[in-house]
Amino acid sequence: QLLRQTNWKDLDYLIVDMPPGTGDIQLTLSQRVPITGAVIVTTPQDIALLDAKKGVTMFQKVGVPILGLVENMAVHICSQCGHAEHIFGEGGGRRMAQEGGMDYLGALPLDIHIRQQADSGAPSVVADPQGEIAQRYLQIARTVAAKIAQQSKDFSAKFPTITVSQDT
C-alpha cells in the first residue's frame, strides 16, 4: 500500500528503512518491487552482525545488489568531554564488509546530537551541514549515489509482459 497507493511524484531515490534480519517485509518488498540495491546497516556487536549477515544472504538470494555496509553506533562520543569509546565493540562492520566482499561505506557515531537534531525536525545535515556528523552522512550518501549511477539499468520489471497470439 505504501509503495503502490502513494503518489511519490518524481523521485530521484526512495529509501526504505527496514527492520533488521530477513523478515516478511524484506522478502515481500524484494519480490514485488524492483529494488536498485540494499545498504546494510549494522552495529559492531556480534549479535547485530549475525542479523546483518542473514540480511545480506537473503538479498543476494533474491538478486538484490548489495551497495555496501554502514556501521551505525560505531563509537560513542561523550557529550560532555568529547571522549570516544567503542562501547559496542570496534570494527565489526568493517570486518564483515571485508570478509563479505562488500564496500564499507562508513561509520556513524552514537552521539546525542543526532537524536536531538532529528527530534527537533532538523536532522544533522540540516541543523549543522558543515559539522562532522553531517559530513559522514553526506559522504555515505554520495558514495551510494555514485554506486547506483554506475549500475547497469534494467527496466524489464517496469513493463508488462506482452504476448502476441495468432488467434484473431
For each feature predicted by the language model, list its residue ranges.
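Flexible phosphate-sensing "switch/lid" loops adjacent to ATP/NTP-binding sites
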Residues: 1-15, 20-22, 28, 32, ...
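Generic structural motif recognizing short loop/turn segments at the entrances and edges of beta-strands
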Residues: 84, 122, 158-160
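C-terminal boundary of histidine-terminating zinc-finger modules
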Residues: 120-135
